[in-house]
Design a protein with these regions (language model features):
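Conserved beta-strand edge residues that scaffold enzyme active sites
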Residues: 18-19, 52, 155
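Short, conserved SAM-binding segment of the class I
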Residues: 2-3, 37
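Mid/C-terminal beta-alpha module of Rossmann-like enzyme folds, strongest
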Residues: 106-176, 187-191
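A short helix->loop->beta-strand "cap" motif at the edges of active sites that frequently abuts
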Residues: 5-11, 41-43
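SDR active-site strand-loop-helix element
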Residues: 12-17, 48-50
């Protein structure tokens, strides 16, 4: 930020994340701290906080959400998990997300450069509809020609497994990622 000020950057655009806060997971706290530092920097800034981003499965070795779900959950010889809190699975897979395509996020970045209304403003970005985890799993399965059978999976079991296994690279999700997944990831306004 100091260098951006020094060289006279006209607008600093930051990719943050939906759900950032000072008391969240390490990822959420780090993103929140970056947002706060930029807001206090003296720069002209715009912050985008997208919901779940999908698209571009060839993106420089970074995991793409739908591809990762297909490979890590739908290609296995057992049902896809529908996570739930509590003792009974009545709400299995019911948390929601507003997925947004990476190209839409990129368009917002580009368009914001010339729009005065975007200066010193934060935008939550999400797709046109909120989908439950159950619906997302179903749609990815349909699109990839995979089976769609699912089974309720209690959060407590996954968290215990994650606390033991998330240090291994082959384990598909960290404890923090799982915590954020269960919080849901929707936005109140879709841009």
């Amino acid at each position: 930020l100091e260098l951006a000020l020094k060289i006279g950057v006209k607008r600093f655009i930051l990719m943050s994340a939906n759900g950032v806060r000072p008391d969240g997971t390490a990822y959420q706290r780090t993103k929140w701290q970056a947002d706060e530092a930029l807001k206090e920097s003296g720069l002209n800034w715009t912050i985008f906080r997208p919901s779940l981003i999908f698209g571009d499965p060839g993106g420089e070795g970074r995991p793409e959400f739908c591809t990762q779900i297909r490979d890590d959950m739908l290609s296995l010889p057992f049902p896809a998990p529908l996570f739930y809190n509590g003792l009974l699975p009545f709400n299995a897979g019911s948390f929601s997300m507003s997925p947004i395509h990476v190209k839409n996020v990129a368009e917002f970045f580009v368009k914001s450069i010339k729009l005065k209304v975007c200066e010193k403003n934060i935008f939550d970005l999400g797709g046109p509809e909120a989908l439950t985890w159950k619906e997302i799993i179903h749609q990815i399965a349909l699109a990839s020609g995979k089976r769609t059978w699912k089974i309720p999976a209690p959060v407590v079991v996954i968290k215990i497994a994650g606390s033991i296994l998330d240090r291994f690279k082959w384990f598909p999700v960290t404890r923090d990622q799982f915590t954020m997944l269960m919080e849901g990831n929707t936005v109140s306004t879709n841009y």
